[in-house]
Amino acid sequence: MKKLILIGIADLSLASCKTISKQYVVRPKSHTETQGTATFTQKKGKVEMDLSVFKLKPGLHAVHIHEFGNCSATDASSAGGHWNPSKDDHGKWQSDHFHMGDIGNLDADKDGQARLTFSTDKWCLGCDDPMKNIIGKSIVIHAGVDDFHTQPTGNAGGRIGCVEIK
């Protein structure tokens, strides 16, 4: 019996050290040509997102995690609203008021290319904690900038790109 318990504990500690990496394609929405990739890597209790997008209009574009992993609608409305398991106000990540879907803004250069990396211990890939698990959610790229205070969306504009996180 003691051997079985020790093996179970060893299995749990090895699982928590495992690196998980998933890559997804950005799908164009709202009759745009938005394209790119989103890679999520979970390692040592943190998730890093690496979002590379092109064919954007130059300037700032809001990025949020939305509540449903469904990008089927032409305007990405099927992704639902911002993922907000704690029911907090919209805001800037790590400010007094923000929710788990608040990521920030991509800054597209004159050629329409942008990259955003983001790392947090507040997300996980497939864990049992619904307050952290981003599997089954989506990333939505918006036409406008997130002003970090307009409720509930940051006045970010239309949805021009969508990623289903599976």
Give the positions of each predicted feature:
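Sec-dependent N-terminal signal peptides
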Residues: 4-12
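N-terminal leader/targeting pre-sequences
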Residues: 17-60, 65-166
